[in-house]
Each structure stands twice: as C-alpha cells, then as structure tokens.
Amino acid sequence: MSRLKKYNEFINTRVGFFSLLIGLLWLKNMFAYVVDFHLSIQNPMQLFILLINPLSVSMLLISIGLFIKRSKVAYTTLFIIYGILSIWLFSNAVYYREFTDFITINTMLGAGQVSTGLGESAVRLFRWYDIFYILDLFALPVLLFKKKIIVEEKHPRFRKAAALSALSLLICSGNIFLAEIDRSGLLSRQFSREYLVKYLGVNAFTVYDSYQTFQNNQIRAEASPNDLKEVKSYIREHYAEPNDSMFGIAKGKNVVYIHLESFQQFLIDYQLTDENGVNHTVTPFLNSLYHGESTYSFDNFFHQVKAGKTSDAETLMENSLFGLNQGALFTQLGDKNTFEAAPNILNQKAGYTSAVFHGHSASFWNRDKTYKHLGFDYFFDSSYYDVNDDNSFQYGMHDKPFLSQSVQYLEHLQQPFYAKFITVSNHYPYSSFKNDEDGFPLATTKDETINGYFATANYLDTALKEFFDYMKASGLYDKSIFVLYGDHYGISNTRNKELASLLGKDSDSWTDFDNAQLQRVPFMIHVPGTTNGGINHTTADRSMLSLLCCIY
C-alpha cells in the first residue's frame, strides 16, 4: 500500500507527470514496433537499441514543459507536446499499413495534391486496437480535471529540468553510437527509412528527415541552368561516332540486366584450394560467359560508388550519372529529379516495357519511388514472392528461389522488355547456406567474412546458370541480350591484406595499387548469336547507357 501511495505522490509532481507521459509514449512505440511496423530483431544489440530509441527525442521535447513556471501552462505544454507525438506515431502506423513506409516531410508537402478521397481511404485503414494509441489523450484530461492527477503548483528546480533534458541528449548520443556500431554508415548512406526508424525511432527519423529535406532544397535552390553549359560543351567536344560494325546488332531484342551483388573481378577464373589441396572453380558458369565468343567482356571496369553503394551503381548504369558525395541519390533525390534513364529512352524510342525484380522491401534505398522517376513500368518487390526464413536473409530472398519465382512475372511482360534482376545472396556477411546449398568449401583465413565470400559467389553462379537454362528453354534467350555487372567491392580495403595470400601475394608488400586493382568488377554484354565478342581492356571509355544505345 505504501508503494502505491508513493507512486501516486510521485505522479502528482510535474516530474512524475512528465515520467508518466514518457512511459506511456514508450509503450505506444513498442506496440507500434511489434504490431504495425513489424521491425525485425537479429541480435541483442538491436533489441536494446529498439528499447531506448523512443526516449531521446520524446524526453527532449516533452521536457520543455518542465522549464515553464506557471503550473497550468506547464501541464498544458507537457500534454500538448505528448499529444502531438502520440498522434504523429499513430499517423505513421496508419500510413505504414497502406504504403509500408514512414511519413516524410515531402510526403506531407505533397499531401495537398492528392487530398481528394484520402479521408475515406484513411478510415478504412483503422483497426480496433488503434484505441491504444489515442485512449489516453481523452483519459488524461479527464483525470486532471477530476483531480485524480493533481497539478503541482511548485515549479521544479531548473537543475532538475536541465538534468532531464541532458539525459535525453545522452540517450540520443548513446543511441546513435550503438546504431553505428551495429549498422555502420546508417546516417551517411541512408539506404532505408525502415532501418532509420528501427535504429533511431520515429521521432528521431522525422528530425533527421527534416534536416535532409532542408539541405536538399538548399542545394536545388542554388542550382542554375548555367551549370549545364560546361557539361554540354564537353559532350560536344568529345562526341564519338557510333561503330558501324556494331551499331544496331541487337535492335528489337529484350534487354536483361543482372546485378551481381558485391561481385569483384578477381572471382572470374578463380580457383579456391581447400584444406585437402583440391581446387574448386568458384564461378564456372560466369567464366564460360566471360570468355564466350558472344560476350563483350571488360576486365578493367571499376565500380564508382560511394555511400549509396548498390543504389549508386544503379544510378550510374541507368543514367550515366555518378552518385552523391554524401548520402545516396536514390534516397535524397530519387523521387524528386527528372531523369533521362535507359527505361525511359527505350520506351520512347522503341516501345519497351520495363520492370525491376528484387526480393527485398520496396522502400529499401527508396526504390519504390525512384524507379517510377527512372521510367520503370513495374517493380516486383518482396511482396510478390513467397519469402520465408528458409529462403531469405536480412537483405532479401536468396538468388535461386528469387530468380525461379521471378519467371512467372517475366513470362507475362510484353516484348520487347527491359528487365533488371537484383541479386543479393553474395552480400556481406557472406554466411554459408542451409541444407543442400551448404556445399562449396570455405576459405581458411583468419577472417570469416573472406572465408564465406567464395561460397556465396559460387551460389550466385549456380543460380545464374539455372536462370539462363530457363531462358533457353523458354525461347527468350535468343530474343534477348544480357548485361551483367558487379555493383561494388565485396571485400573492403581493411580486409585486403588478409585476402592477399589467396591471391598469391604477400600481405607485407601489399600496396595502395593492389587495393585499387581490387576495385574492379565484372562487366559483360552477352549477345546470343554474335561471334565477335572478346575481352576488352578499356580503362575508361563510354558509359553503359551509350554502349547500350550503340547496339540498338
């Protein structure tokens, strides 16, 4: 009984009322994480981060009321800020049910353009359990009015209010620190709004999104048409006439892009020696393509990505544009810019239907919005596939079931089509596979990441062979050309010295030049029916977009 009395006495203080609001908001966030957002937890660190991330911004904002001397104004301020944060969380929960995404500043700015009919649509998204989000917004004023919660007239000391605000900043700093440990580059790469909410919370994500939106608007405001003069002048001066022997050799054929995740050039023709001294070819199928007479291969092709990683590679290949110096173009500008991208060009010039296939969340790298601006007609994300724990991991569906299940959608695309398949199995941390897929030997270095890299690359290779076998059996093979490219490095420079021995080099004599050479990734254009292919040693020439245009 004494404990209950002490609790009631504490709640009847301003700090106690503040603590009650923080506790209720924390519970609502936990409820939303589990019931509406379905945020996945892979390790104890992520669980701890998820438990603390609703606190920082909430505590900082609600604590504003503790600095106000007049009691009624103070309590009103505390409750209003709490109410706004509760409604904002509820709004995100409802929005997520329809769009599997979170509300951004740009979403709100554009809401007026599609406001007609939104009211009825939103009502249909409500659930019976939504009462949990809003019940206390009615109950707390009643409890205050009936003096079940007493308004404390005494103003808390400035030090106490400041200490609570400082605690919120400390939690925020710790939250970001732990998030960067568990997910390096979270803020700089900005690859997924879901990841940002998972690691930072809804409110912190909104603050971060507001800053990014302001920064992007400033950059756009400073842009001038005069900036293009130098670019246009350079293009005119360096114009290259099409090669008559190659121009138009693939006219009217389907285009199939295959995005090789984290695949480096040194894997081509590489043989891994196991602990018994037996050599195992890592990529026999890709080797046969690479050296085939119908493939135009490039062995000096360097990835050119930064924080955007995979999305930067897509930006480059689709538009002949580099990514951003900071952050990812897909997430910052993908749903705002107007692009002259390959899907658009092929549709306008030759009536191509375009589609992207990817067994991961549509919002990852902001793909669902960016692809529309690139001109893609369809985007088949994870919601179109039978994804389960056995055939997927944290970055999406494994390549074999992904490519196999993609066939049903590819078959129904109107020809000629432009289709891109984004594979993910050869992705860090390069873990071994379950069941019958766990067969290729691991390397035996001290670095587990390097050890698994060859096995996942081999899995990708066998998945591609199965896909090409299907294309041949269906009759689509001879009607298509295939563009295969590695998006970026798989083994980072910090691990290269450990990799050196597997490449026949001495780690003690490893240089920056060796690091640079490992930034090469495969690039092949396979054109069935041609016989004048080969390996090109071009160092820097035309972009993928210009090469594609030349053979069409």
What are these regions (language model features)?
Residues 2-211:
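Transmembrane and membrane-interface helices of multi-pass
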Residues 8, 12, 225-228, 478:
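Low-complexity, intrinsically disordered short peptide segments enriched in small/polar/basic residues
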Residues 65-69, 74-75, 81, 229-232, ...:
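Glycosyltransferases that elongate glycans
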Residues 103-109, 223-226, 540:
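Short coil/turn linker and secondary-structure boundary residues
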Residues 113-114, 230, 285:
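Exposed alpha-helical structural elements
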Residues 200-214, 262, 479, 496-497:
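Conserved acidic functional residues
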Residues 210-233:
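Membrane-anchoring hydrophobic helices of lipid-metabolizing enzymes
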Residues 233-552:
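Solvent-exposed soluble domains appended to multi-pass membrane proteins
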